[in-house]
Structure formats: C-alpha cells, structure tokens
C-alpha cells in the first residue's frame, strides 16, 4: 500500500456537494408533509414526532411497516419517469398498516443510487412527499446513499418505513371474521407495485440498461397507444401509481362502520393476501368464472396475463386482479358499509363471501 496515491472521497465517486444540493432541493417538499406533532426539520440525526396525543387513547398500539417498490423501478428508469414511484413506496407501507386499522403517523425513506443528481433526486422524493400527503403522514427523515462502482449511475432502489397507531379496542382482527361475512373490494389503478418481474419478461425489458439507445427504443415502443388498453400506452398503464386507501378507510372506521378485517392485496395476489385477513376456521370464496372475475379487471392486467398465457389460478396469485384492498363485513352491514364508501368517493364491489373452512382462499369456479 506504500505506493498508493492520495484519493479523495470525490475521487472514489461520492459527490457530497451534490448530495447537499439534493437535500436543499427537497426541504420544502418534506416540510409540506408536516403534521402538528413534527418537531424540527430535516438535517438532524433523527426525526422527531410528539406522542403526546396518544394519551387520549385507551391503549395505543404502535404499528410499523416497511416495504419497497420492487422491479417496477426498472421500468421507471427505462422510461426516465421517476415522479410517481415515491407514491408507490408510501402506498406499499401505509396500506399494510391500514389493514390493522392504524393511522400512519410518519414515514422515512431510503434511496440507494449509483450517482446522486439533485434534480433526479427531487423527482423521486416529490413522489414520496405526494404519497405522504395522500396518507396524511409526515415525512420525518430519510437517507440518500450514493453507491459508486456498485450500482450504475442512473440505477436506484427505494425502501420505505412507516409507523402508525391504533387504539387496541378499535384494532381490526381477522379472528372476528365469521362464515357468512361478505368480502368487498376497492379498485386498484392497475398492477400497483407487484408482479413486475413477470411484467418485465412479457414486455421485454430484461437486460436493458437505462440511458442506452436500446432503452430509448424500448421507451418509444412502450409509449405507443394500444387498442387493448383503451388507447393508453403500456408505459402509462404500468407506471400508474399504487392507490393509497388511508383517508377514506380511516374516515369510514371513525364514522363507526363495522369492519371485521382488511386485506391489502400485494405480492402473491388475491390468493396469498386475502387469506391473511381470515380466521383459522374460515375460507374466502372469491367470485370467478374461468378467466373472468366477478368485477371489472383493469385492461393492463388482462393484457399482461394473456401475453404470459397465465392460467386463472396463476394470475390470481400474481396480480391484484383489480382489487387493491378487501374489506370483510357482516352480511347485515354490507349495504351500510357500501353506501358509506360510495359517499366517500369509493367504488366498492363484492369480491365474494366467507364460509366454514381452514383459512384458505378458494374460487367459486373450483367448488
């Protein structure tokens, strides 16, 4: 090592000055997500959030969640469209804790990137901030990690973390689900943030590096309108941000709606998520007739499923099939909950019903 020359951090590929500019570019976005409980601003060693209001609860339970966006980011990078993947990140975390009836309080993000550019970073964090505002939670901190020599300059990955609270007497519990209960669904915007490893195979983007002529040609191809998608492009349909269901569902619960359980339909589709909201002695029977579900499926999910030649069972354990969130309610409460959801601007539909069983999801065309 004696013949080694002087090397700076910048020589190694880490641009701390550009990192500082990136922080300056996002400060106002972060501030705009603040709740009254937030103490101070970004730049400290930890995000501060007052818990004083929790004393008004009988037994406050803190619920945490963490997730990422997965390989949907590959498509965003090829298309050079980064403004909404942050909303995907927030949605994946806050919708998960919403399944327990929790209100998201605050959020933190982690961005690993090959090379930090302030303008690029601002686009990503704007999506995170927009998602936090949709969820009503504060963005109290985060990390931008530059990984030169490990990741390509334009390559990045995202992770998110949220903490929420629910009063124990109001916490949703799958143990409350009974045979005869009705399963209601709320529509997704499309694929949301799961199933993109399959999507990438179908649309032929595997192995394409962002910023290359090959990526530009593929981006042009994916931007063309398709008749099968009602004139939308594959890029638009596949990059539609994941819905955040927090505000309407919390309002529904605060208004006294009797909801037994909620399932966020993510990786594993209906088959491997709805079962997580069931009691051990209950099965969910989901309405299906062959490749047709009992509700409208977004055209992009139908398109990808057909291109991949997925059997109905494979599609249902890969994609959300147009259902972003499921609510399980007693049959006598179905009409009231449906009416309340409509009043909140939602478009609920019946997904199926619960029967005696062993905690599985089954389909009506297989019974």
What role is predicted for each listed range?
Residues 2-11, 120, 124-138, 151-158, ...:
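Glycine-/charge-enriched secondary-structure boundary and capping motifs
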Residues 2-37:
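N-terminal amphipathic/basic leader segments beginning at the initiator methionine
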Residues 12, 16, 80, 189-192, ...:
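Hydrophobic alpha-helical scaffolding
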Residues 15, 67, 180, 264, ...:
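Residue-level signature of catalytic and energy-coupling elements of molecular machines
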Residues 23, 122-125, 196:
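Hydrophobic face of alpha-helices
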Residues 26, 48, 93-94, 199-202, ...:
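Buried hydrophobic packing segments
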Residues 28-189, 285:
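Glycine-rich phosphate/pyrophosphate-binding loop regions near the starts of catalytic domains
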Residues 66, 157, 170-230, 234, ...:
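Short, acidic (Asp/Glu-rich) active-site segment that either coordinates a divalent metal cofactor
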């Amino acid at each position: 090592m004696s013949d080694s020359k002087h090397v700076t951090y910048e020589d190694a590929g880490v641009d701390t000055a550009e990192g500082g500019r990136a922080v300056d570019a996002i400060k106002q976005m972060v501030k705009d997500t603040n709740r009254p409980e937030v103490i101070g601003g970004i730049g400290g060693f930890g995000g501060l959030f007052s818990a004083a209001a929790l004393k008004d609860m009988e037994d406050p339970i803190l619920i945490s969640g963490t997730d990422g966006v997965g390989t949907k980011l590959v498509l965003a990078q090829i298309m050079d469209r980064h403004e909404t993947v942050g909303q995907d990140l927030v949605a994946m975390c806050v919708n998960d804790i919403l399944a327990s009836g929790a209100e998201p309080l605050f959020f933190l993000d982690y961005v690993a990137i090959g090379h930090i550019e302030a303008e690029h970073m601002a686009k990503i964090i704007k999506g995170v901030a927009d998602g936090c505002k949709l969820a009503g939670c504060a963005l109290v901190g985060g990390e931008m990690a530059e990984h030169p020599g490990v990741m390509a300059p334009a390559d990045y990955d995202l992770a998110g973390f949220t903490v929420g609270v629910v009063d124990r007497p109001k916490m949703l519990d799958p143990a409350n689900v009974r045979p005869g209960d009705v399963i209601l669904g709320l529509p997704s915007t499309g694929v949301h943030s799961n199933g993109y490893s399959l999507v990438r195979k179908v649309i032929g983007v595997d192995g394409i590096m962002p910023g290359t002529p090959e990526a530009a040609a593929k981006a042009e191809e994916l931007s063309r309108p398709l008749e099968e998608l009602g004139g939308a492009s594959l890029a638009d349909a596949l990059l539609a941000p994941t819905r955040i269901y927090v505000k309407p569902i919390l309002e529904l619960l605060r208004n006294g709606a009797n909801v037994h359980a909620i399932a966020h339909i993510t990786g594993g589709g209906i088959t491997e998520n709805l079962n997580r909201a069931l009691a051990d002695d209950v099965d969910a029977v989901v309405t299906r007739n062959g490749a047709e579900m009992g509700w409208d499926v977004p055209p992009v999910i139908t398109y990808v499923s057909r291109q991949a030649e997925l059997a109905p069972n494979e599609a249902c354990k890969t994609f959300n099939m147009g259902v972003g969130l499921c609510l399980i309610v007693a049959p006598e409460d179905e009409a009231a909950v449906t009416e309340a959801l409509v009043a909140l601007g939602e478009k609920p539909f019946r997904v199926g019903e619960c029967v005696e069983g062993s905690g599985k999801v089954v389909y009506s065309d297989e019974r």
